[in-house]
From Swiss-Prot:
Keyword set includes Membrane: no
Function noted in UniProt: Activates KDO (a required 8-carbon sugar) for incorporation into bacterial lipopolysaccharide in Gram-negative bacteria.
Subcellular location, record wording: Cytoplasm
Family listed: Belongs to the KdsB family.
Involved pathway(s): Nucleotide-sugar biosynthesis; CMP-3-deoxy-D-manno-octulosonate biosynthesis; CMP-3-deoxy-D-manno-octulosonate from 3-deoxy-D-manno-octulosonate and CTP: step 1/1; Bacterial outer membrane biogenesis; lipopolysaccharide biosynthesis
Gene symbol of the encoding locus: kdsB
EC number: 2.7.7.38
A GO CC annotation given for this chain: cytosol
Source species: Chlamydia trachomatis serovar D (strain ATCC VR-885 / DSM 19411 / UW-3/Cx)
UniProt entry tagged with the keyword Transferase: yes
Entry-linked InterPro entries: Cytidylyl_trans (IPR003329), KdsB (IPR004528), Nucleotide-diphossugar_trans (IPR029044)
Keywords: Cytoplasm, Lipopolysaccharide biosynthesis, Nucleotidyltransferase, Transferase
Family annotation (CDD domains): CMP-KDO-Synthetase
One GO term of the biological process aspect: lipopolysaccharide biosynthetic process
Name listed for the protein in its UniProt record: 3-deoxy-manno-octulosonate cytidylyltransferase
Length: 254
């Protein structure tokens, strides 16, 4: 695993079997390929990463990733969330890493340009501890549902708040609303700090762990993207939506 030792920009795809909403989700088939394989192959197309690896504590997922030719690392079962799984892999296997991208395994339609944009934004903003992506939306369902996280940020691209509520509230002046895309780029040193930040009142209220960063006064910058992602997979019925989306993309390319 020479790439592990020398990689400076690393993409980690945490993958777990026991999703309460969709057990076994990583191995669900989408037009003949599993969710984890599609997510992994998308990440491999990034121009900015030196190495991409799946991190899992499940032998079935590990065996499958190895079978399709991907890189995979087994992690401990004590990780409380995907970010802790990412940090464990980086601290153990990537001594030279400088930038770490946490790639969500439920975004099979994520464009690799999103990953490249995250890395570029982090490199170009020395004050940023971490970077995440957002995209503008006018979809009323996405705006109103608490399953989609919204974000507001300042003129310099620094996040002010994340919420499951519709923010900002357009009471008197129409303002763009941005949906959060759950992909993060960290400086390695800050990632080690991040996993040690205790839950905060706002992070518990919203059930959004990134709010811990804002509550202690650290900075999250945002990278605004357009048309760079499709439907995500949260429930079994989302598989059909993703397949329809991919088929439409395939037809449009001809």
């Amino acid at each position: 695993m020479f790439a592990f030792l020398t990689s400076k920009k690393v993409g980690i795809l945490p993958s777990r079997w026991g999703s309460s909403r969709f057990p076994g989700k990583p191995l669900a088939k989408i037009l003949g390929k599993t969710l984890v394989q599609r997510s992994y192959e998308n990440a491999l197309s990034s121009q900015s990463l030196d190495c991409v690896v799946v991190a899992t504590d499940d032998q079935r997922i590990f065996d499958h990733v190895v079978e399709f030719g991907g890189l995979c690392v087994m992690t401990s079962t004590s990780c409380a969330n995907g970010t802790e799984r990412v940090e464990e892999v980086v601290s153990r296997h990537f001594p030279q890493a400088e930038i770490v991208v946490n790639i969500q395994g439920d975004e099979p339609c994520l464009s690799p340009t999103v990953i490249d944009g995250l890395v570029s934004t982090l490199e170009n903003n020395p004050a940023a501890d971490m970077v995440t992506s957002v995209t503008e939306t006018t979809d009323p369902e996405a705006i109103l549902t608490d399953h989609k996280v919204k974000c507001v940020f300042d003129k310099n691209g620094k996040a002010l708040y994340f919420s499951r509520s519709a923010i900002p509230h357009n009471f008197k002046h129409p303002t763009p609303i941005y949906l959060h895309i759950g992909v993060y780029a960290f400086r390695k040193a800050f990632l080690s700090e991040y996993v040690k930040i205790p839950p905060s009142s706002l992070s518990l209220a919203e059930d959004l762990e990134q709010l811990r960063v804002l509550e202690i006064g650290r900075s999250i910058y945002v990278h605004v993207v357009q048309n760079a992602t499709g439907p995500s997979v949260d429930y079994p019925e989302d598989i059909t939506k993703v397949e329809q989306y991919l088929l439409c993309l395939s037809k449009a390319s001809f």
